[in-house]
């Protein structure tokens, strides 16, 4: 079904409705799909032995109003959903939050061993705060229900806060792992000297 849907999208406007599943199955039914997803444009497509890999560019949050199946794949009637931006995005507290998540996201990328210039190139490519929160959320390892929760958080400020918490948690995890590694190395060094 998914391959047929991709083929159909490629023949028309290249738009798909990307939505997460509650259960991992090859043939999803509407009842296991979350209602909110993203209208996305198919960018690159790579076909390989393991199937098809797509690069999707998210364009707009949307909610599925109705699903139907025709020609072997599922289609959806969707309604776009607007995010809630702060009344004043030059509010000092909002600007500070946006700056903090940018700095912590860069730190996380570098701690994961990515080259600094690559991290900054990716992060600097998005200036709009809501899109930035979405970009960072895409790089964070989270269970599907948590990622879905971020997608459904329409307040940009709240989404930035929630993503920042996840980023800080992952930095803390990496710090703890580095600490454990260094303790193990120390113990190994002491044992070798004995």
Language model feature labels by segment:
Residues 1-194:
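N-terminal low-complexity, acidic/polar interaction/targeting segments
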């Amino acid at each position: 079904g998914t391959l047929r849907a991709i083929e159909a999208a490629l023949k028309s406007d290249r738009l798909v409705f990307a939505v997460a599943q509650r259960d991992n199955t090859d043939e999803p039914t509407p009842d296991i799909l979350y209602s909110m997803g993203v209208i996305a444009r198919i960018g690159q497509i790579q076909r390989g032995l393991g199937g098809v890999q797509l690069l999707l560019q998210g364009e707009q949050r949307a909610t599925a109003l109705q699903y139907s199946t025709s020609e072997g794949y599922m289609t959806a009637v969707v309604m776009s959903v607007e995010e809630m931006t702060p009344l004043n995005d030059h509010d000092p507290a909002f600007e500070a939050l946006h700056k903090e998540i940018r700095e912590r996201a860069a730190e996380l990328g570098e701690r994961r061993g990515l080259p600094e210039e690559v991290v900054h190139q990716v992060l600097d490519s998005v200036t709009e705060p809501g899109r930035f929160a979405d970009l960072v959320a895409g790089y964070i390892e989270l269970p599907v229900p948590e990622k879905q929760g971020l997608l459904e958080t329409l307040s940009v400020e709240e989404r930035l806060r929630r993503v920042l918490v996840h980023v800080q948690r992952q930095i803390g995890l990496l710090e703890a792992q580095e600490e454990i590694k260094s303790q193990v190395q120390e113990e190994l060094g002491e044992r070798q000297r004995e």
